[in-house]
């Protein structure tokens, strides 16, 4: 992979201490998107990684997964599918709940967005626990999609989400890694 592009991307991601709560060092990808060279480098690296792999759909999770998944889908010439929180999608949906640190959350996808045999790549900004992508994987598979790959801009490997997703049979790719939570 292009180390110059990775360095540019990593340097553009601001770290915000004690957000959203004390003890968390938040990695802010919105600062990456403020830098057009870093944003383009991110999309270019994703395209270089996944072009020619035969994906028929790109799925992005709410909300920052949209910001990387949609441009990737355009570059690969495939459809983009948003996975959203309940009540945000207008057509018939299927839902999947998942556990959070304190409680549960739910994601939805249009039932007609994935057809049997679609080869799907999931994209999100950051991999921490893997709960969001695990729920997304279940939604795609429930609709008959084939999902074996998940791509992230950032991985926080100490939290263990990559291992969790590998346990679901997913190949996990991230552009850069950061220590901590």
Curated annotation (Swiss-Prot):
PROSITE patterns recorded: PUR_PYR_PR_TRANSFER
Gene3D superfamilies (alphabetical): 3.40.50.2020
Highest taxon listed in the record's lineage: Bacteria
Coiled-coil intervals, chain numbering: none
Biological process, per Gene Ontology: adenine salvage; AMP salvage; purine ribonucleoside salvage
GO cellular component: cytoplasm
Catalysed reactions, as listed in the record: AMP + diphosphate = 5-phospho-alpha-D-ribose 1-diphosphate + adenine
Pathway listed: Purine metabolism; AMP biosynthesis via salvage pathway; AMP from adenine: step 1/1
Matches recorded under SUPFAM superfamilies: PRTase-like
EC number assigned by the record: 2.4.2.7
Primary localisation category: cytoplasm
EC category: transferase
Keywords, in A-Z order: Cytoplasm, Glycosyltransferase, Purine salvage, Transferase
CDD domains cross-referenced by the UniProt entry: PRTases_typeI
Intracellular or extracellular location(s): Cytoplasm
InterPro entries according to UniProt: Ade_phspho_trans, PRibTrfase_dom, PRTase-like, UPRTase/APRTase
GO molecular function: adenine binding; adenine phosphoribosyltransferase activity; AMP binding
Subunit architecture: Homodimer.
Family: Belongs to the purine/pyrimidine phosphoribosyltransferase family.
Role noted for this protein: Catalyzes a salvage reaction resulting in the formation of AMP, that is energically less costly than de novo synthesis.
Name listed for the protein in its UniProt record: Adenine phosphoribosyltransferase
């Amino acid at each position: 992979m292009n180390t110059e592009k990775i360095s540019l991307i990593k340097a553009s991601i601001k770290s915000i201490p004690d957000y959203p709560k004390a003890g968390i060092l938040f990695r802010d990808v919105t600062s990456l998107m403020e830098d057009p060279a870093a944003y383009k480098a991110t999309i270019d690296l994703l395209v270089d990684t996944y072009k020619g792999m035969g994906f028929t759909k790109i799925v992005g999770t709410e909300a920052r997964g949209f910001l990387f998944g949609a441009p990737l889908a355009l570059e690969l010439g495939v459809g983009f599918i948003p996975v959203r929180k309940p009540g945000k999608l207008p057509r018939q949906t299927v839902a999947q709940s998942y556990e959070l640190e304190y409680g549960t959350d739910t994601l939805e996808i249009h039932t007609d967005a994935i057809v049997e045999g679609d080869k799907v790549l999931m994209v999100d900004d950051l991999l921490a626990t893997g709960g969001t992508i695990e729920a997304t994987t279940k939604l795609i598979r429930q609709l008959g999609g084939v999902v074996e790959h998940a791509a992230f801009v950032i991985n926080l490997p100490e939290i263990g989400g990559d291992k969790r997703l590998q346990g679901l049979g997913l190949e996990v790719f991230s552009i850069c890694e950061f220590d901590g939570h």
